[in-house]
Amino acid sequence: MTQSNPNEQNVELNRTSLYWGLLLIFVLAILFSNYFFN
């Protein structure tokens, strides 16, 4: 039970959430571009 483990997990969670956020924005941008162009 060291304090480095939860800190590392929090960093990984922040990175994964950031990647998922960017992916979601990317997909939404594609959907909106397809909607406007069509």
UniProtKB/Swiss-Prot annotation:
Which Pfam families does the record match to this protein? PsbL (PF02419)
Q: Thylakoid among the record's keywords?
A: yes
Where it sits in the cell: the answer is: Plastid, Chloroplast thylakoid membrane
Its transmembrane ranges are 17-37
Q: Which domain of life is it from?
A: Eukaryota
Q: Which GO terms describe its biological process?
A: photosynthesis
Keywords linked to the UniProt accession: Chloroplast, Membrane, Photosynthesis, Photosystem II, Plastid, Reaction center, Thylakoid, Transmembrane, Transmembrane helix
Which GO cellular component terms, listed alphabetically, does the Swiss-Prot or TrEMBL entry include?
chloroplast thylakoid membrane; photosystem II reaction center
Q: What kind of membrane protein is this, topologically? A: Single-pass membrane protein
Subunit organization: PSII is composed of 1 copy each of membrane proteins PsbA, PsbB, PsbC, PsbD, PsbE, PsbF, PsbH, PsbI, PsbJ, PsbK, PsbL, PsbM, PsbT, PsbX, PsbY, PsbZ, Psb30/Ycf12, at least 3 peripheral proteins of the oxygen-evolving complex and a large number of cofactors. It forms dimeric complexes.
What task does this protein carry out? One of the components of the core complex of photosystem II (PSII). PSII is a light-driven water:plastoquinone oxidoreductase that uses light energy to abstract electrons from H(2)O, generating O(2) and a proton gradient subsequently used for ATP formation. It consists of a core antenna complex that captures photons, and an electron transfer chain that converts photonic excitation into a charge separation. This subunit is found at the monomer-monomer interface and is required for correct PSII assembly and/or dimerization.
Protein family per UniProt: Belongs to the PsbL family.
Identify the NCBIfam families for this entry: PRK00753.1
- What name is this protein filed under? Photosystem II reaction center protein L
Print the organism lineage: Eukaryota, Viridiplantae, Streptophyta, Embryophyta, Tracheophyta
Q: Which gene encodes it?
A: psbL
